[in-house]
Amino acid sequence: IRRQRQMCIRDRFRLNNQNRGSGNKESLWVLQYDYLNPGSNTDYNASFSFIPYYQNIKITAKNEAGEEVNTTAFLGVTDGKCGRGIGWIQPTSHFFNDIWSKGSENDIRNSEYNIIRDVRIDNPESPAFGQWLVKDGYYKQLDSIRQWYPLMTKISRVNNFPEEFYQKDANGNPLMTPFGEHLVINSANGSYKDVYLFRLAETYLLRAEAYVNKGDQAKAAADVNTVRSRANADPAQPAEVNIDYILDERLRELYCEELRMLTLCRMGKLADRNRRYNPRTGMSIEDYHNLWPIPYSEIERNVYATIEQNPGY
């Protein structure tokens, strides 16, 4: 049963399975991408932004003579590590750790297939070849802001990139790492598949939010548990389902999908959640940042009405 649920979670994001025409009854609105059709949206550069800048990682390890040797950890960008990223968007520790603790220890959305938390060092010239970047402690040498954090596979075609993006030798044969991953070119930084804008799971969570605002936690929990049961997560208890719980559940279900800032602003939780969970922006964010300033040009254009600027600007 666990494997069936695992495949159900993964299937939602595999190639050619986002649209209702493919039998996916969860999709509501899907953005269409065709990288081979210049008349279409050709790419969704999620990997470029969300995946860390791992390809230039350098580590120091001792060789057989006991000498410290500094080399790159990886041969380059690979399809097994979600393509080329530059680490523009790094999720918080709250996402990578906190939300998967109580009641979500067995949550398939956090499985090693959906969030890759460790990878093997694949450069044969490194004394650390074959060891694990995290388990064996090499990640401690790195810039954890951009160079390394877990890989979120839903945004990419992991181990299934279009062949046009493979690196090849002089005879046209694909180049691979010793561990079977295809080396890909630097422009391999997209999803190369259609992308959900809305799907049914979010609808359940929206209705759960409405029930919470009405004070009906039992119905809110029922909707939340419709989503959680598929992921093999423990059921939420009505007493614990509040707006913060729903925001955490949206993280678990919709990470790398929803426009998170819009959700937080809509709920009036932007400043609060940043102060609690984001050590970088939390130090400087103010309550008034929940609304953006109205452009002065728009205020000027409305000659028949007085438009007040949003507070704080």
Where are these regions (language model features)?
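Long, intrinsically disordered, low-complexity segments
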Residues: 2, 10-75, 164-168, 172-197, ...
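Flexible, polar/acidic helix-loop-strand segments at domain edges
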Residues: 65, 72-199
